[in-house]
């Protein structure tokens, strides 16, 4: 069992969610986060091309020390679905430009379903 954590652009969340659903992956957790890599900040790209929001976003980025708003997706999967998820996220989000995102894969050693007390792979929605 693995956890896949993907950090993507905010404006790519719906496309990513649809592509994962089309690939048979429907269970996930997502949240807003702030972060940055080593690249420089190019505001129009990070703002999803919505020119009306430039002033608001510039002000917000200044408050947060130039951290960029992103989406973080967490998926807990059986080992055999990890490559499918990774390939799908890359296919949808890869533009070849700085800020496309990051994907991390981590082992999950134990899991339980609170409602039933089941444990292990049985708790995964497949």
Regions found by a protein language model. Give the residues of each.
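Positively charged, small/polar-rich N-terminal and surface patches that mediate targeting and assembly
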Residues: 1-126
């Amino acid at each position: 069992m693995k956890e896949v954590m993907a950090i993507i652009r905010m404006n790519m969340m719906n496309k990513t969610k649809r592509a994962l659903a089309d690939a048979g992956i429907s269970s996930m957790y997502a949240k807003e986060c702030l972060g940055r890599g080593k690249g420089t900040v190019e505001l129009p790209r990070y703002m999803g091309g919505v020119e009306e929001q430039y002033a608001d976003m510039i002000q917000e980025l200044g408050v947060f020390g130039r951290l960029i708003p992103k989406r973080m997706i967490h998926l807990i999967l059986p080992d055999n679905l990890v490559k499918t998820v990774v390939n799908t996220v890359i296919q949808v989000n890869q533009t070849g430009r700085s800020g496309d995102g990051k994907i991390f894969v981590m082992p999950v050693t134990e899991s339980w379903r609170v409602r039933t007390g089941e444990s292990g792979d049985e708790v995964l929605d497949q």
